[in-house]
Amino acid sequence: MITVAFSCSKTLTSYGMRCGALILFAQNETDVNDTMTVMEKYARATWSNINNSAMDNFVYVVTDNRDNFLKEKETYIDIMKERSDIFLKEAKDCGLDIYPYKEGFFVTLKIEDQKLAEKVHSAFMDHHIYTVLVNKGIRVAVCSVSVPKVKGLAKKMKDIINCLSE
């Protein structure tokens, strides 16, 4: 059996509404039904039911407002691509080590020494570069940085890391 879970909260920019789904794939319908029953009981016992506004929003977006949603979504995808392309190019140009990145909200700097990562994270904060410390790296939210501010960010980060590494 294969299960695929997704969140509508981020996809439909409905943060906090907690709307999502789990899709089950199996060759045996009985297995799917049994798993669906278990998941339904577990989800209801853990989170109760989603609120009506989340359900209404989902239905509205995928029916009446689908074309507008897809158009708006494409706009944000383009913005994210522009921001990440700038950051990735500048990171490569200055030698800032990052984990492989395909797409998404975050680029993660690769810093395997966790003590150094903690120092770097703190230094970033001192320079008003707000990041999230993660295991063996630092997460940069390119989704929250405007295009003008993302320009030069990788170099600033690399310079800070170099100062701490000396």
Language-model segment annotations:
Residues 114-166:
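PLP-dependent enzyme catalytic core of the Aspartate aminotransferase-like
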Residues 11, 33, 90, 97-101, ...:
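Localized chelating/binding microdomains
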Residues 1-77:
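Conserved core segment of the aminotransferase class I/II
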Residues 60-64, 86, 90-94, 123, ...:
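Alpha-helical structural signal in soluble globular domains
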Residues 23, 108-110, 141-143:
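Short hydrophobic/aromatic beta-strand micro-patches
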Residues 59, 72-88, 97-110, 133-136:
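Conserved glycine-rich beta-strand-loop-beta hairpin in the small C-terminal domain of fold type I
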Residues 52-55, 84-85, 118:
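Short, surface-exposed alpha-helical segments at coil->helix boundaries
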